[in-house]
């Protein structure tokens, strides 16, 4: 649905709004990166299994493990230890995930008022975090041992934050400012 929405109406409206000469200049979504850090994975090798499976259910794609770049004694982490998992979504899976995120997960998120414009990085990319991964319907609350958060990065081809915000607003992203 989101892919058709982009192709049928968003491209035309953004082309008119920003006076692009060609539809290839219209910003588009490139990829969505989802990262889930796991605090106990450094000491317990089995601690990564549950978040790994949860991220697989949420994204619909097999995640990869992330490893520590250097040792930090305060966190009891050694270089090369597994510290989390991540997945990169593109094309149809990206649009399907964003649809579930906007219409299902964000309305179920506690104390969620909307996103801030300050969450853009200056290059047209948007990053935010979700405090509870149980906001997604794919996660069964009774089968998890711990509620975890996740970081979501949306990469666009927009040249500026203003263009990226208009693109995300067209996809019904909730901004409060």
From Swiss-Prot:
It comes from the Bacteria. The keyword GTP-binding does not apply. Keywords: Ribonucleoprotein, Ribosomal protein, RNA-binding, rRNA-binding, tRNA-binding. GO terms for biological process: translation. GO terms for molecular function: rRNA binding; structural constituent of ribosome; tRNA binding. The keyword Repeat does not apply. PROSITE patterns: RIBOSOMAL_L5. GO terms for cellular component: ribonucleoprotein complex; ribosome. PANTHER family: 60S RIBOSOMAL PROTEIN L11-RELATED. Part of the 50S ribosomal subunit; part of the 5S rRNA/L5/L18/L25 subcomplex. Contacts the 5S rRNA and the P site tRNA. Forms a bridge to the 30S subunit in the 70S ribosome. This is one of the proteins that bind and probably mediate the attachment of the 5S RNA into the large ribosomal subunit, where it forms part of the central protuberance. In the 70S ribosome it contacts protein S13 of the 30S subunit (bridge B1b), connecting the 2 subunits; this bridge is implicated in subunit movement. Contacts the P site tRNA; the 5S rRNA and some of its associated proteins might help stabilize positioning of ribosome-bound tRNAs. Belongs to the universal ribosomal protein uL5 family. This is Large ribosomal subunit protein uL5. It comes from Wolbachia sp. subsp. Brugia malayi (strain TRS). The gene is rplE.
């Amino acid at each position: 649905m989101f892919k058709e929405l982009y192709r049928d109406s968003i491209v035309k409206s953004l082309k008119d709004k920003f006076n692009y000469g060609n539809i290839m200049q219209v910003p588009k979504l490139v990829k969505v990166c989802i990262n889930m850090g796991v605090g106990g994975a450094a000491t317990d090798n089995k601690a990564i299994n549950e978040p790994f499976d949860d991220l697989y259910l949420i994204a619909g794609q097999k995640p990869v493990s992330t490893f520590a770049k250097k040792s930090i004694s305060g966190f009891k982490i050694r270089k090369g230890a597994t510290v989390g998992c991540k997945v990169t979504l593109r094309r149809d899976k990206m649009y399907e995930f964003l649809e579930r995120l906007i219409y299902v997960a964000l309305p179920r998120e506690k104390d969620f008022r909307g996103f801030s414009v300050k969450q853009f990085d200056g290059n047209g990319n948007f990053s935010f975090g979700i405090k509870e991964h149980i906001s997604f319907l794919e996660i069964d609350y009774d089968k998890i041992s711990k509620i975890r958060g996740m970081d979501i990065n949306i990469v666009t081809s927009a040249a500026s934050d203003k263009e990226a915000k208009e693109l995300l607003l067209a996809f019904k992203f909730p901004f409060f400012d």
